[in-house]
């Protein structure tokens, strides 16, 4: 080309820039003029005469000092999703969003932003590559990953190339399309036709980069990826699908995006071992091998191990321990959350799910789908008339084209799946029950190694047994083995935290050093002799403490390093075991033998040496850390969860049962026969001799008022379940009307209160281990006894919402005042001993009960216990108990209370009334002791640290009459006075 021609081109460029400026001034978009300018450049570069090497692409008008262009209007870009960009080529084609997929068009628009951020005016191929690589979850990144190329290295190479390109500083007229950008899009159109697609997609653009001599070819050479490798990666990602809409990228590798390969996790050893559940796994395999409706659904309570059954199946598939129809299959867990997330427009969710189902169908039965919480497919994606996931799955589930395993809880299965009969019949139920305590212990033993490896601690077998037993008894509302596993996990985490934290001994020394250092700074300013002596002594103490701190730190670091070393060896051993399993599966016996008899033996020897070193250090007495989880740790965690004292949890069950009478008699005075009957019923249950399908015991307490019937129920609740709150008290005087009976099990549908549950059923559902006390049962309406019949016989009640509430872990106590006059008259009119009279009196009282209660109700009660009236000796013991309670309350006011035996007898005589039992005693103490002490405290007669004596004095009334006793309160001068019966 001659110099005159070149000057002519420059003049035309200046005129185009001026036209763009005029368009800008008139409020019109300069896009077409700039695009035409780029088109001229590409035309001259492609089909015209050859440009000299010094000729730069026209970028604007020619100025005196260089190329000057007016700035573009704010917030304007070369490509806008709603605008078309025209460039002049031999085909005079046009860039429109309608010919690109959404992700490809985002890349085209993003290339302009990449150029602007790089301060470059010409948008070239490298900017397009950068935009495609920066797309989150973009198709370009997935294709490069599939080809084995690190996306970071591709982006880094692209950035380096961009940084070498010339930058434009100062005012510019906006970005311009470069020739390489144009050729990339042209070649992408050709590849679109090659694939018989309807839209230009990201993979077409990547194929076009292999023909770009300016940037793309060199990039792929540096990455060592050829065109064939790129085509294979694209085929692996998109499979056999065609681009028929503008969002095909979301459907590529749908299973990989929206599913988790459980067989791959099992192959890599990422799944926990599954202990037991062989029957359930075998049943699932049996259903999966059917011709049609080969879809098991695992139902059970939350935490019993439904997902673990699917994991166990995945592990068996990897091991080859399955029938031929399931050999070498993949078990994919569908992530419904990922499937729904980001589906903004109607139809997107259905497209994703159809893509997943299409991949499963294309696998010809090689893929088994697992949907955890399968009830979520009912209604999922159904909005504005769209079909939900359940309806999309139904045809394939029925024909056997899709083998699907579901898992859900009983309540959600009933609430969602059973309502859709067409969906329910396509699934076959596999019930997963709660394992027994013995099975839970086996499961924990199987999981122990995994938790030891994760936390870097040891877990004793006693801790596992304790976790299963204590969780089964005290943690209600959850199910085994989940709650037992959580106990072990939390106890191990607590111990690990203690190991990594500073030991208490070292922490105390550190704090003491800080305190002495501060005291030393304070003493340095004093010049008196005592301060100097104190300073010298303090410096000596500091020196000693710092030496101790150094020794303790060294011991701690050494012990911690040994534990870390043991943990790393165990992790390496676990990795080697996985490699051995993989080698044996692939029949690489040389590799397996090398690992098993070489590497593994070496690791075991290293582990033994490290453990011996740790044991020697611990036996030397220098150890500051604990590495084993024991049953005490488990009991502490249970105590934190439930509030039950640790000492009660650790006390053996046998010891507690043997001492049952003594414990009950601490609060229940007298009533030896009643206490013994209750203790025998509880021991019978705990020994496993009672019916497991009935309550622990159902007892009826009959006797006069105030003799300890309700108190025995409270004491029994505290003994059995370590808290008095475990007593559920139902006052039957509130259920005298017929309409009030429904409050026990909940209001029926249509009535106010439906859905809130019943007072009895909800209380037992929340606290299954409890004592249920029906107080004054004879006052209840007759319909109440109809409810109690099934409770006493079957140990269960169905509430108003159809939920079955179990009473098999409850003690049922009913109190009644029937026969009270008979009991009092019998004892008052006989001189025989209580034991001799008891059986006759009991028979007479039961005969009276038969007149009030129906035979079918009385026949279901385990034992009738008749309480006897209290005598003076027992009343005096109750007085002592009540005075000790007053004493404890006064202790909070820092006032000490003591009393004499005479005072106890006097109060007992005043409060004794066989007709009213022990209740008058409380009133007498309240009037004669508590009122007087309160008055004296307010007057100032009794102050803090005073000792108050409750005594009796004799008062003469008149000559010839015996003096009367009077209760007196006096402040003791000598607080050390020895008195009897004060504790």
Curated annotation (Swiss-Prot):
Q: Kindly state one GO CC term assigned in the UniProt record.
A: cytoplasm
The subcellular location is: Mitochondrion
The chain's disulfide connectivity reads none
Transit peptide, residues from-to: 1-87
GO terms of molecular function: ATP binding; ATP hydrolysis activity
Q: Chief location of this protein? A: mitochondrion
Q: Does the keyword Metal-binding apply?
A: no
Q: Has the keyword Ribosomal protein been applied to this entry?
A: no
Tell me where in this chain the Clp R domain is found: 97-240
Q: Where is this region: Repeat 1?
A: 100-165
Span list, region Repeat 2: 177-240
At the top level of its lineage, which domain of life is listed?
Answer: Eukaryota
Coiled coil where? 504-627
Similarity-based family: Belongs to the ClpA/ClpB family.
Protein's UniProt name? Chaperone protein ClpB3, mitochondrial
């Amino acid at each position: 080309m001659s110099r005159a021609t070149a000057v002519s081109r420059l003049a035309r460029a200046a005129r185009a820039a001026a036209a763009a400026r005029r368009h800008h001034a008139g409020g019109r978009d300069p896009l077409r003029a700039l695009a035409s300018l780029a088109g001229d450049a590409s035309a001259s570069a492609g089909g015209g005469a050859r440009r000299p090497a010094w000729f730069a692409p026209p970028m604007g008008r020619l100025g005196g000092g260089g190329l000057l262009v007016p700035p573009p209007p704010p917030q304007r870009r070369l490509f806008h999703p709603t605008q078309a960009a025209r460039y002049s080529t031999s085909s005079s084609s046009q860039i429109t969003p309608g010919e690109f997929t959404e992700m490809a068009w985002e890349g085209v628009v993003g290339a302009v932003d990449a150029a602007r951020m790089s301060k470059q005016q010409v948008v070239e191929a490298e900017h397009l590559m950068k935009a495609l690589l920066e797309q989150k979850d973009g198709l370009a990144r997935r294709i490069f990953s599939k080809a084995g190329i690190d996306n970071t290295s591709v982006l880094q190479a692209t950035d380096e190339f961009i940084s070498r390109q010339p930058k434009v500083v100062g005012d510019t007229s906006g970005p311009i399309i470069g020739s390489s950008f144009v050729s990339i899009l042209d070649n992408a159109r050709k590849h679109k036709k090659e694939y018989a697609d309807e839209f230009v997609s990201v993979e077409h653009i990547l194929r076009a980069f292999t023909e770009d001599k300016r940037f793309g070819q060199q990039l792929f050479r540096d990455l060592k990826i050829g065109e064939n490798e790129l085509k294979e990666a694209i085929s692996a990602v998109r499979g056999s699908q065609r681009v028929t809409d503008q969002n095909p990228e979301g459907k590529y590798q749908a299973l990989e995006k929206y599913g988790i390969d459980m067989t791959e996790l099992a192959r890599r050893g990422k799944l926990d071992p599954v202990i037991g559940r062989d029957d359930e796994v075998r049943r699932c395999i049996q259903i999966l091998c059917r011709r049609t409706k080969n879809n098991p659904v695992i139902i059970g309570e939350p935490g019993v191990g439904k997902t673990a059954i699917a994991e166990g199946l995945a592990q068996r598939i990897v091991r080859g321990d399955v029938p031929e129809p399931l050999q070498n299959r993949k078990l994919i867990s569908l992530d419904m959350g990922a499937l729904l997330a980001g589906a903004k427009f109607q139809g997107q969710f259905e497209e994703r799910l159809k893509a997943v189902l299409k991949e499963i169908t294309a696998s010809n039965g090689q893929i088994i789908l697992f949907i955890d919480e399968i009830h979520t497919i009912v209604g999922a994606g159904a909005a504005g008339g769209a079909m939900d996931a359940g309806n999309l799955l139904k045809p394939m589930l029925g024909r056997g084209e899709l083998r699907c395993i579901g898992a859900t809880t009983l309540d959600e299965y009933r609430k969602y799946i059973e309502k859709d009969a067409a969906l329910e019949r396509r699934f076959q139920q596999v019930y997963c029950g709660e394992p027994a305590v013995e099975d839970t212990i086996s499961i924990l033993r199987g999981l122990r190694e995994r938790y030891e490896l994760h936390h870097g601690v040891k877990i004793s077998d006693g801790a596992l047994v304790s976790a299963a037993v204590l969780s089964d008894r005290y943690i209600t509302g959850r199910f085994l083995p989940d709650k037992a596993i959580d106990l072990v996990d939390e106890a191990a985490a607590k111990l690990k935290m203690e190991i990594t934290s500073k030991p208490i001994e070292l922490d105390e020394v550190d704090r003491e050093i800080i305190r002495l250092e501060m005291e030393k700074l304070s003493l340095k300013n004093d010049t008196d002799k005592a301060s100097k002596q104190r300073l010298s002594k303090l410096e000596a103490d500091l020196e000693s403490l710092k030496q101790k701190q150094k020794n303790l730190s060294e011991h701690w670091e050494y012990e911690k390093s040994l534990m870390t070393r043991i943990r790393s060896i165990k992790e390496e051993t676990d990795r080697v075991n996985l490699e051995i399993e993989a080698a044996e599966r692939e029949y690489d016996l040389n590799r397996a033998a090398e690992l098993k008899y070489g590497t593994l033996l070496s690791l075991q020897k290293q582990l033994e040496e490290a453990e011996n070193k740790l044991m020697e250090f611990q036996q030397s007495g220098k150890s500051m850390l604990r590495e084993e989880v024991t049953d005490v740790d488990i009991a502490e965690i249970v105590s934190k969860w439930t509030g039950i004292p640790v000492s009660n949890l650790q006390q053996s069950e046998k010891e507690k049962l043997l001492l049952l009478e003594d414990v009950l008699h601490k609060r229940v005075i007298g009533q030896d026969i009643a206490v013994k009957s209750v203790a025998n019923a509880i021991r019978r249950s705990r020994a496993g001799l009672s019916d497991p399908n009935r309550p622990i015991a159902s007892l009826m307490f009959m006797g006069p008022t105030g003799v300890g019937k309700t108190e025995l129920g409270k004491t029994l609740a505290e003994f059995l379940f370590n808290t008095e709150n475990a007593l559920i008290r139902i006052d039957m005087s509130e259920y005298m009307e017929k309409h009030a009976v429904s409050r026990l099990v909940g209001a029926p549908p249509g009535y106010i209160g439906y859905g809130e549950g019943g007072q009895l059923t909800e209380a037992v559902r929340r606290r299954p281990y409890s004592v249920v006390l029906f107080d004054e049962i004879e006052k209840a309406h007759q319909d109440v006894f109809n409810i109690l019949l099934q409770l006493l016989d079957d140990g269960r009640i169905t509430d108003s919402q159809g939920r079955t509430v179990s009473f098999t872990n409850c003690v049922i106590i009913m109190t009644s005042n029937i026969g009270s006059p008979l009991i009092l008259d019998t004892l008052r009119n006989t001189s025989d001993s209580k034991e001799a009279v008891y059986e006759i009196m009991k028979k007479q009282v039961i005969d009276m009960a038969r007149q009030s209660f129906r035979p079918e109700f009385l026949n279901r009660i385990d034992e009738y216990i008749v309480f006897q009236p209290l005598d003076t000796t027992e009343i005096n013991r109750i007085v002592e108990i009540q005075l000790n309670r007053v004493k404890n309350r006064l202790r909070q006011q820092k006032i000490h209370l003591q009393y004499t035996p005479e005072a106890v007898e006097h109060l007992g005589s005043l409060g004794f009334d066989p007709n009213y039992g022990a209740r008058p005693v409380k009133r007498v103490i309240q009037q004669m002791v508590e009122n007087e002490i309160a008055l004296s405290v307010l007057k100032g007669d009794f102050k803090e640290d005073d000792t108050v004596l409750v005594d009796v004095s004799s008062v003469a009334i008149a000559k010839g009459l015996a003096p009367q006793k009077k209760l007196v309160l006096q402040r003791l001068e000598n607080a050390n006075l020895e008195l009897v019966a004060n504790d």
